[in-house]
Regions:
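Hydrophobic helix-and-loop "lid/oligomerization" segment in the mid-to-C-terminal part
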Residues: 1-35
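Secreted, periplasmic, or luminal enzymes acting at the cell surface/secretory milieu
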Residues: 21, 26-182
Length: 183
């Protein structure tokens, strides 16, 4: 299993980089179970040449600059999706049941549906809103938030030319790379 592989690799090496090659967010709290995991690289949908660049990121010759485009949680069983999904049965579709039974020998007699209720509170929008509303403790639920990502360099930000005329607020931000590598 993947867990057995991680156990073996992390018991043999003190510096481990985990590469997640998956297009969908997943539960990632397990990362904290291994002291030797020093980095997690998200490499979804790499296409024809993406994996070739991965080695350059791992060896430090290319600075990773991507950010997460969704939220990665600690426990999927606590997500709205997990708790709203199910096989709910219709009880007013007798004609449909008969038609299905006549054409499908594997039919077991239930016409089910999914009660999808997240609405606008899907993905990172749910976690940000639920945290602001006091429904969840963000740090207890979210492992890697929307927009998370590290770099091999450091930056300094400075706000300049702040102006508030009552109707509009304007300002400029100067971002300076203060590290030794491009970012």
């Amino acid at each position: 299993t993947e867990e057995a592989m991680l156990d073996k690799v992390c018991s043999e090496f003190s510096k481990v980089i985990v590469v997640i090659n998956a297009n969908n967010p997943m539960e990632l709290d397990w990362v904290d179970n291994y002291d030797s995991i020093g980095a997690v690289i998200l490499a979804p949908g790499t296409g024809q040449t993406g994996m070739a660049a991965l080695g350059e990121i791992i060896n430090g010759s290319v600075n990773p600059s991507g950010k997460t485009v969704d939220t990665y949680v600690k426990d999927l069983t606590q997500t709205p999706y997990y708790n709203n999904i199910g096989a709910f049965a219709y009880n007013n579709v007798d004609d449909l049941k008969e038609a299905i039974a006549a054409s499908d020998t594997a039919y077991e007699g239930t016409v089910s549906f999914v009660d999808y209720v997240e609405g606008i509170y899907v993905g990172y929008k749910y976690y940000e809103t639920a945290s602001d509303d006091g429904v969840i403790n963000y740090e207890d639920v979210v492992k890697y938030p929307f927009g998370y990502g590290l770099s091999y360099t450091t930056f300094e930000q400075k706000m300049n030319d702040f102006s508030d005329n009552g109707d509009n607020v304007t300002f400029n931000v100067t971002v300076t790379n203060t590290g030794d590598v491009a970012g």
